[in-house]
Each structure stands twice: as structure tokens, then as C-alpha cells.
């Protein structure tokens, strides 16, 4: 699955087995921390039983990231795929979600959230398990009417991962250099009409 995520269908990512396992634990609704006590026979049976859904959600999430214009060159946090895959799983989203007109607004909301979370420093670093658990809890109870951006951002802010930018952060973004890791994300916000699935 890792090689398929990273290089199939034109994708170029560098997802690891750890990201796949973290996603599997998230989707099966078990404790997602990498602790020996979490890898019980019961939990691993849940992962095995849910593997087709886990695999499908991860592959669709990787395709979405590719459609958003991301690759290993500019995806600054591989962990962002975890909540995307979980959300797609909860929705029961099939391949049609990736390009259906009916889901275009939802994909755009998801893309904007992903982009802001990648532009803002410190979101996907320390405290990752707490962040992913909070996002999972919000998605589990708020995913029926599309990606719940406001609820997710509120939960993120509650654990010190606000997506609000202050003036100093905005000034820093204005000074990003060509080919910097976050430059693509900032430009994708400034030029929303571009087809970002094309490689620039």
C-alpha cells in the first residue's frame, strides 16, 4: 500500500508505514498512539477487518492531495492525510467524490483547510496524537453536512493549534522564497482558479 500511495496514478509522495498505520488506527476508532498496549489482538483484528475501507480511504485521500497540487516536494506534513482519509471514510466517499460536481464545494472547503494547516507553522509537529484525536472526535460527530471546517478549527485551537495568522506570520509569508516548501501552499491561496493538479 505504501508504494501505491506514493507512486501510483502519477502520484509522487513519501508517505511512510507509520502514516498508514496511524490512519488505520484512526479509521478503526482505537487509540492512535504508538504504544505497545494499543497493539492488541482485538485492535489488530479491527484493522484487518477494516483494511479494504482503510486502503480505499487512503488512496482517495492521496489522490485528493494530488488534485490539490501537492507532492513530496511541497507537502510539508504527511500526517495531514490522516484526517482527510478519516473524513472520506466517514462519508463513505467513493471514487466519484474526487470529481463529482455535487461535492465540489466540499472538496474546496477541505482543500482550503488543508492548505492553511500546511502554511501555518507548528500544526502537524509536536502533540500530533492529541491533535489527530481531537480532529477525529469532531469529524465523528459533525461530518454529515460536509467537512466541518469551523468545528475542526475550534478543536485545533483548543489544543494550541489555531489556524489564525497574526501580522508577524503574514509578514513572514510575504517573504517566502521561490521553491520554498510552503510557497506553493501560499500561492495556491492567492490563485484559487488554477488547476493545481497540473505540475508547475
Which residues are covered by each model-predicted region?
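Mixed-charge, low-complexity interaction segments
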Residues: 40, 55-56, 60-63, 70, ...
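Short intrinsically disordered, low-complexity coil segments enriched in acidic
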Residues: 1-5, 103, 200
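Polyanionic (Asp/Glu-rich) segments that form extended negatively charged tracts
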Residues: 1-93
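Serine/threonine-rich low-complexity intrinsically disordered regions
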Residues: 29, 40-43, 71, 99, ...
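Intrinsically disordered, low-complexity N-proximal targeting/linker segments that flank membranes
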Residues: 118-200
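Generic hydrophobic, helix-prone segments enriched in Leu/Val/Ile
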Residues: 50-54, 114, 187-188
Amino acid at each position: 500500500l505504501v508504494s501505491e500511495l506514493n507512486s501510483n496514478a502519477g502520484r509522487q509522495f513519501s508517505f511512510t508505514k507509520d502514516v498508514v498505520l496511524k490512519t488505520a488506527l484512526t479509521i478503526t476508532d482505537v487509540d492512535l498512539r504508538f504504544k505497545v498496549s494499543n497493539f492488541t489482538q482485538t485492535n489488530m483484528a479491527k484493522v484487518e477487518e477494516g483494511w479494504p475501507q482503510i486502503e480505499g480511504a487512503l488512496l482517495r485521500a492521496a489522490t485528493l492531495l494530488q488534485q490539490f497540487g501537492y507532492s513530496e516536494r511541497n507537502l510539508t506534513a504527511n500526517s495531514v492525510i490522516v484526517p482527510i482519509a478519516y473524513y472520506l471514510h466517514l462519508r463513505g466517499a467513493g471514487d466519484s467524490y474526487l470529481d463529482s460536481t455535487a461535492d465540489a464545494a466540499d472538496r474546496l472547503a477541505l482543500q482550503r483547510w488543508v492548505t492553511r494547516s500546511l502554511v501555518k507553522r507548528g500544526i502537524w509537529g509536536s502533540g500530533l496524537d492529541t491533535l489527530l484525536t481531537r480532529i477525529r472526535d469532531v469529524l465523528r460527530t459533525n461530518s454529515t453536512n460536509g467537512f466541518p471546517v469551523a468545528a475542526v478549527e475550534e478543536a485545533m485551537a483548543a489544543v494550541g493549534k489555531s489556524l489564525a495568522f497574526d501580522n508577524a506570520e503574514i509578514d513572514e509569508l510575504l517573504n517566502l522564497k521561490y521553491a520554498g516548501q510552503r510557497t506553493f501552499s501560499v500561492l495556491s491561496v492567492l490563485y484559487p482558479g488554477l488547476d493545481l493538479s497540473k505540475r508547475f
